[in-house]
Swiss-Prot record:
UniProt entry tagged with the keyword Endoplasmic reticulum: yes
Gene label: ARE2
UniProt entry keywords in alphabetical sequence: Acyltransferase, Endoplasmic reticulum, Membrane, Transferase, Transmembrane, Transmembrane helix
Motif FYXDWWN motif, chain ranges: 531-537
Transmembrane segments: 223-243, 300-320, 412-432, 450-470, 493-513, 575-595, 630-650
Protein known as: Sterol O-acyltransferase 2
UniProt topology in membrane: Multi-pass membrane protein
Entry GO CC: endoplasmic reticulum membrane
Secretion signal span: none
Family, as annotated: Belongs to the membrane-bound acyltransferase family. Sterol o-acyltransferase subfamily.
Keyword Oxidoreductase: no
Summary of the function given for this chain in its UniProt record: Sterol O-acyltransferase that catalyzes the formation of stery esters.
Ranges of Polar residues composition bias in the record: 64-75
Subcellular location: Endoplasmic reticulum membrane
Length: 650
């Protein structure tokens, strides 16, 4: 009976019982930094908690969180009370400590008690992993799956004329039979893959009572030839522009400003980029210290990691601007790459931080269950411990299904983090879908696409954009003659730069999200090539923000959207606003790196997407998808040009 009382009055067990209550439906997580003092328990040296992750990961829309039950013992995970005291005295001591620290306890409860996650799907006993918000699988990119691969494997030339002639013969035979009152032969639609038919009904001329079905053919064709013609036109246009520039500048390219930008300080940029990459392994060191029991993730590990992440971006911004004084092109490259590395560090660190909490709770639940299972009469107590063990075991085991040697915490090693940094993804997990081999011909195609696209971008920037940018700087540095005059000049610059920016936007997207990411994915045998969706068909900015950049969207979904719901008790709308706000701040920082001017134009346009999303969800716009797509493309064509000229002119 004393053991029953010990367990039922143990604060740690009461937390786990609440987390796993079948009628509660949510798994609450409460952290107090000085839990050891509050509960009068000592923490195991070989475990780290993970309460600060709070990342939502699940298809459920409720906020997600980490939750852990610290291992309260000196050895083997057994529950240990204050030495030299009976169970009754120990309970009284815990009560007094809690009462004396009541204000601290309440503060932590108010901050963290909202962190919760449903462990079971509604109406079933199936677990919901904290990482159910996304899944990786073997799949090609959209351009490869819809255009490139079919063109290379299925293109046979013109087929429409052959199918039309076949259908014409069938139609003439059908009409002839109808004229003589004979039944129409069945047309095999499968024999006409290039044609789509609609069905109408008529009556026989000789037998009005007979209803006859006639199929009307709608033409459809393969446009692969136009795909070839498009790139052919781009290539000839680029060659012509290159030749014209060559002769206009006395047979030399040395005067090209864009070429100078691209080739200045290459060795310095490469060295800084290497140092920046190597410095990301700091988070691996933090996880090693947690693994060895030197640091506790919940109290110090997460704090060291978060501070380092802020210093990481700030330091390299300061280094490139104030010390090295690099050109704007070098600065924006290093800044954007630092953001990529920052997101990778954060995902690796807080993924493992969450699993430290799960592992700790499993240790506590197993030890408590082994000690009290036969002596506790309350079935709810045993049920809570068993559910905790089941869920934590499921969560840990489901992270590494194919390679047990990388099972947490064995995944915390330099080689594992190195491979993650090589993969074209910002979301860390222990295993990813992989292809069987590297297609070196495919790699060569993508390398050619990379350098070819960069070549086109340089020509576009040199001929269509750079002259307009220089005129914009002249306008900014000219004598102020009034806002109206400045706006008129700005409007003229805007009209001139729009065509070049449209081309640059499309080429930039293709270069990064298709050519580079697919090349890296092939070299690392990374199977999931879903780097972007069909954003060109978007009818709202909400769709665009989700599918134009899938890797970043996944990161924001897990580490910002769900995390803000858990940590700051935000609802879905507030979490969405929070995500847009953070994204807008980062985009504005990018503009500061380029223009060295803090004007908040891009921040304003980014946040403007929020009311635009609400507008597209209205009854008037929801069913007008064509208008929505036209408005979307108007924004894509005008938006970058408007922002660039605003930063340059004002």
């Amino acid at each position: 009976m004393d053991k029953n009382k010990d367990l039922l009055e143990n604060e740690q067990f009461l937390r786990i019982q609440k987390l796993n209550a079948s009628d509660a439906g949510k798994r609450q997580s409460i952290l107090v930094d000085n839990e050891d003092e509050l509960y009068g328990l000592t923490s195991s040296n070989n475990s780290c908690a993970s309460e600060h992750e709070g990342e939502g990961e699940g298809e459920d829309e409720r906020p997600a969180t980490t939750s852990s039950a610290p291992t309260q013992n000196h050895s083997a995970g057994d529950v240990a009370f204050i030495p030299g005291k009976t169970a009754e005295e120990d309970t009284e001591t815990v009560t007094k400590v809690v009462e004396s620290d009541d204000q601290v306890f309440r503060t932590h409860v108010q901050t963290l008690s909202s962190k919760g996650k449903s462990r079971y799907r509604k109406g079933s006993s199936n677990f919901i992993s904290f990482f159910d918000d996304m899944a990786f699988e073997n799949r090609p990119s959209i351009l490869d799956g819809s255009v490139n691969d079919p063109f290379k494997t299925k293109f046979v030339g013109p087929t429409l004329e052959k199918e039309i002639r076949k259908r014409e013969k069938e139609l003439m035979a059908m009409r002839k039979n109808l004229h003589h009152g004979k039944p129409a032969p069945d047309a095999d639609a499968a024999d006409a893959p290039a044609l789509t038919t609609t069905t109408t009904t008529t009556t026989s001329a000789t037998s009005p009572e007979t209803v006859v079905t006639i199929e009307t053919t709608i033409l459809s064709s393969n446009f692969s030839g136009l795909y070839v013609a498009f790139w052919m036109a781009i290539a000839f246009g680029a060659v012509k522009a290159l030749i014209d520039y060559y002769y206009q500048h006395n047979g030399s390219f040395k005067d090209s400003e864009i070429l100078k930008f691209m080739t200045t300080n290459l060795s310095t940029v490469a060295l800084i980029d290497l140092i920046m990459y190597l410095s990301t392994f700091f988070v691996v060191g933090i996880q090693y210290l947690c693994k060895w029991g030197v640091l506790n993730w919940s109290s110090t590990g997460w704090a060291f990691t978060s501070i380092y992440e802020l210093l990481f971006v700030g330091f390299y911004m300061y280094l490139t601007e104030n010390i090295l004084k690099l050109h704007w092109l070098s600065k924006i490259f290093l800044f954007l790459h630092s953001l990529v590395l920052l997101m990778k560090m954060h995902s690796f660190a807080f993924y493992n931080g969450y699993l430290w909490g799960i592992k700790q709770e499993l240790q506590f639940s197993k030890s408590a269950l082994a000690k009290y299972k036969d002596s506790v009469n309350d079935p709810d107590v045993v049920d809570a411990l068993e559910k905790s063990c089941e869920f934590c075991s499921f969560e840990l085991n489901s992270q590494s299904l194919n390679d047990q040697t990388q099972k947490f915490p064995n995944n915390i090693n330099v080689s594992n983090f190195f491979m993650f940094t090589m993969f074209p993804t910002l979301i860390y997990q222990i295993e990813y879908p992989r292809t069987k081999e590297i297609r070196w011909v495919y790699v060569l195609e993508k390398i050619c696409a990379i350098f070819g696209t960069i070549f086109l971008m340089m020509i576009d920037a040199q001929i269509l954009m750079h002259p307009v940018a220089m005129r914009a700087l002249d306008v900014r540095n000219s004598e102020w003659t009034g806002i109206l005059d400045r706006l008129l000049k700005w409007a003229g610059l805007l009209v001139d730069i729009v065509p070049g920016f449209i081309v640059m936007y499309i080429l930039d997207f293709y270069l990064i999200w298709d050519a580079i990411l697919n090349c890296v994915a092939e070299l690392t045998r990374f199977g999931d090539r879903y780097f972007y969706g069909d954003w060109w068909n978007c009818v709202s900015w909400a769709d665009f923000s989700r599918i134009w950049n899938i890797p970043v969207h996944k990161f924001l979904l897990r580490h910002v959207y769900h995390s803000s719901m858990s940590s700051f008790k935000l609802n879905k709308s507030q979490a969405t606003l929070m995500t847009f706000f953070l994204s807008s701040v980062v985009h504005e920082l990018a503009m500061y790196v380029i223009f060295k001017r803090l004007r908040f134009y891009l921040f304003f346009f980014q946040m403007l997407q929020v009311p635009l999303v609400a507008l597209t969800n209205t009854k008037y716009m929801k069913d007008r998808t064509v208008i929505g797509n036209v408005i979307f493309w108007l924004g894509i064509c005008m938006g970058p040009s408007v922002m660039c000229t605003l930063y340059l002119t004002f």
